[in-house]
């Protein structure tokens, strides 16, 4: 059994999602958003760091998974996103959590089955996979999708390393 904290980083809104993995079962623990309403970037980064640190204290996760930076059309936005990621990662590393990073396309492919999925599709699948009563907020759903992706990737890595990977008719079982 392990508790995974997933993060969807942003300099204005950082989503977080916490799930518990027990074998192949996933259980929703909590999710939400860290909102930074101030204008100056250094203060926003401080708030991201403090918010992620508080979430780590509250939920005591075993590992930390975060979305990688994608190349945005706006270079300034990509740089700010990278800095917000850095603030979140430092919060995890300061608590000795292992950090795992996943590309947005990999996350969408894992959760929806389509690497080019829309946000609404991710929300719907997160709701379905975690048996939630309603769709979570978009940024929280993205963070939960990061955590779900980590569960699937780590589960498959465990199956491969333990020799429990069975191939039949070209499909994984």
Swiss-Prot record:
Its EC number is 3.1.21.10. NCBIfam families: ruvC (TIGR00228). Gene3D superfamilies: Ribonuclease H-like superfamily/Ribonuclease H (3.30.420.10). GO terms for biological process: DNA recombination; DNA repair. It comes from the Bacteria. PROSITE patterns: RUVC. One of its GO terms (molecular function) is crossover junction DNA endonuclease activity. Its cofactor is Mg(2+). Mg(2+) 1 binds at residues 8, 139. It catalyses: Endonucleolytic cleavage at a junction such as a reciprocal single-stranded crossover between two homologous DNA duplexes (Holliday junction). Belongs to the RuvC family. Binds 2 Mg(2+) ion per subunit. The RuvA-RuvB-RuvC complex processes Holliday junction (HJ) DNA during genetic recombination and DNA repair. Endonuclease that resolves HJ intermediates. Cleaves cruciform DNA by making single-stranded nicks across the HJ at symmetrical positions within the homologous arms, yielding a 5'-phosphate and a 3'-hydroxyl group; requires a central core of homology in the junction. The consensus cleavage sequence is 5'-(A/T)TT(C/G)-3'. Cleavage occurs on the 3'-side of the TT dinucleotide at the point of strand exchange. This is Crossover junction endodeoxyribonuclease RuvC. The gene is ruvC. Signal peptide: none annotated. SUPFAM superfamilies: Ribonuclease H-like (SSF53098). Keywords: Cytoplasm, DNA damage, DNA recombination, DNA repair, DNA-binding, Endonuclease, Hydrolase, Magnesium, Metal-binding, Nuclease. One of its GO terms (cellular component) is cytoplasm. Pfam families: RuvC. Mg(2+) 2 binds at residue 67. The keyword DNA damage applies.
């Amino acid at each position: 059994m392990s508790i995974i904290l997933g993060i969807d980083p942003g300099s204005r809104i950082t989503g977080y999602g916490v799930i518990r993995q027990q074998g192949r079962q996933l259980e929703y623990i909590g999710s939400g958003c860290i909102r930074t309403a101030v204008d100056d970037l250094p203060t926003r980064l401080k708030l991201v760091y403090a918010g992620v640190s508080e979430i780590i204290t509250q939920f005591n996760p075993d590992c930390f998974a975060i979305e990688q930076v994608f190349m945005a059309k706006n270079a300034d936005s990509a740089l700010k996103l990278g800095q917000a990621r850095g603030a979140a990662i430092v919060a995890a590393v300061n608590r000795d959590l292992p950090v795992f990073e996943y590309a947005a396309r990999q996350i969408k492919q894992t959760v929806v089955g389509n690497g080019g999925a829309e946000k609404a599709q991710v929300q719907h699948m997160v709701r379905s996979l975690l048996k939630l009563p309603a769709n979570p907020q978009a940024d929280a759903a993205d963070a939960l999708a990061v955590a779900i992706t980590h569960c699937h990737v780590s589960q498959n890595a465990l199956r491969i390393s333990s020799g429990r990977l069975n191939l039949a008719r070209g499909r994984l079982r």
